[in-house]
């Protein structure tokens, strides 16, 4: 049986009893409890960095905990911006958050739907007739990964081009071309659920076409600004220098084979092994993964989307409609036997200890950004690390569980 923690009553109730009560040092009981929790969270990430620095190639961890909707939150950081160790990170140091961007893209489309500009059961053919091979694919199928469209990011040709020049700029159309069926370019299609970044590059083009202005402008004006996400950035061309300067270095350590050629001898990204990817061009991720942010802002986004501050209730309900990542069929929720569900840019998982949680890990060539929202506890955890580790070495899920245990007491 899952051990249930009622986060609202546990934390708010405890605070209500302690308000106005001072410790011997003059600190309120509430402040003392928060200070103690911060120290324990700090110890968690310090220990993780010490334990996993070599295996994962990380030099920095940033974490943020939001214990209820109006909680000011707790930020903890550890480590340095690069391998030299000379410059410590702080709570506004920036990380790429990768595929967490997908939920922003879905939200923009659903905001456009709510405004009557499109419907997510329209098709690629309705909006992007230049891709007739995918004309019958619905926008909904793009967003919940049931389109059958291959992912450009695992195409060996694309990976070789990326490895040859990490500063190369890719347009959305160029990315799509790596996956689009053409003479000499036939990646396998899929049935059911298949995670494809191409889906969200197409979705980003539809956002721009239906919205009448660029994806960049829409994500800034319709999401970052109203949610006061002041440490979040997206640029389809090139990140501004002042944003890059605020980023920690990010290290690539995973020269694995392509998903489409799993039996390779040398992975196509091997030339990038060990490199710092901070200044690498992020256009290759686009509307599928191009946002740069902080754990605090990521948690603010999670509160906003699940709290109903981003899209109307009808559209939020659509975002949360799941398909099984095992079968591709609709499910109402995840279970121990069917533990993974994907909505419209959002994912639900079943955890043996934590039960049903909304959880997403975004990974780029040098960064990881992850959140967990536990509705039963009204708790949001967000963490960022500065590497893509070797296959089998990503233990960020264990870190999230440690942080949860610390908060829950």
What is each residue range found by the language model?
Residues 22-36:
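C-terminal region of N-terminal signal peptides and the immediate post-cleavage residues
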Residues 62, 367-368:
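Flexible, Gly/Pro-enriched loop and linker segments at secondary-structure and domain junctions
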């Amino acid at each position: 049986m899952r051990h249930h923690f009622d986060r609202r009553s546990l934390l708010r109730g405890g605070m209500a009893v302690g308000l106005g009560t001072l410790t011997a040092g003059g600190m309120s009981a509430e402040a003392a409890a928060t200070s103690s929790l911060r120290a324990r969270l700090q110890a968690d990430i310090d220990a993780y960095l010490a334990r996993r620095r070599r295996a994962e190639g990380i030099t920095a961890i940033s974490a943020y905990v939001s214990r209820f909707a109006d909680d000011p939150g707790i930020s903890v950081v550890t480590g340095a911006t690069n391998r030299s160790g000379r410059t410590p990170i702080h709570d506004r140091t920036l990380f790429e958050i990768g595929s967490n961007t997908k939920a922003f893209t879905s939200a923009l489309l659903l905001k456009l739907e709510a405004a009557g500009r499109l419907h997510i059961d329209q098709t690629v053919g309705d909006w992007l007739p230049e891709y007739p091979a995918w004309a019958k694919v619905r926008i909904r199928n793009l967003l919940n990964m049931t389109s059958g469209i291959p992912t450009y990011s695992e195409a060996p040709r694309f990976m070789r081009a990326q490895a040859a020049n990490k500063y190369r700029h890719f347009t959305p159309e160029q990315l799509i071309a790596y996956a689009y069926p053409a003479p000499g370019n036939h990646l396998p299609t899929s049935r059911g659920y298949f995670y494809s970044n191409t889906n969200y590059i197409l979705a980003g083009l539809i956002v721009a076409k239906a919205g009448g202005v660029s994806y960049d402008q829409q994500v800034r004006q319709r999401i970052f600004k109203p949610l006061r996400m002041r440490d979040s950035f997206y640029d389809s061309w090139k990140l501004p220098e002042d944003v890059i300067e605020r980023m920690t270095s990010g290290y690539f350590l995973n020269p694995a084979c392509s998903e489409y050629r799993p039996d390779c001898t040398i992975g196509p990204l091997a030339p990038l092994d060990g490199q710092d990817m901070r200044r690498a061009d992020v256009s290759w991720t686009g509307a599928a993964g191009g946002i740069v942010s902080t754990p605090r802002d990521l948690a603010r986004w999670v509160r906003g989307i699940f709290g109903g501050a981003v899209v109307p209730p009808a559209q939020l309900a659509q975002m949360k409609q799941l398909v099984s990542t095992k079968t591709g069929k609709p499910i109402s929720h995840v279970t121990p036997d069917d533990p993974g569900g994907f909505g419209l840019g959002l994912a639900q998982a079943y955890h043996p200890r934590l039960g049903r949680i909304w959880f997403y890990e975004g990974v780029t060539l040098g960064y990881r950004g992850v959140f967990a929202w536990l509705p039963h506890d009204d708790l949001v955890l967000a963490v960022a690390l500065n590497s893509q580790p070797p296959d089998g070495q990503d233990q960020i899920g264990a870190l999230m569980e440690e942080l949860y245990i610390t908060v829950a007491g």
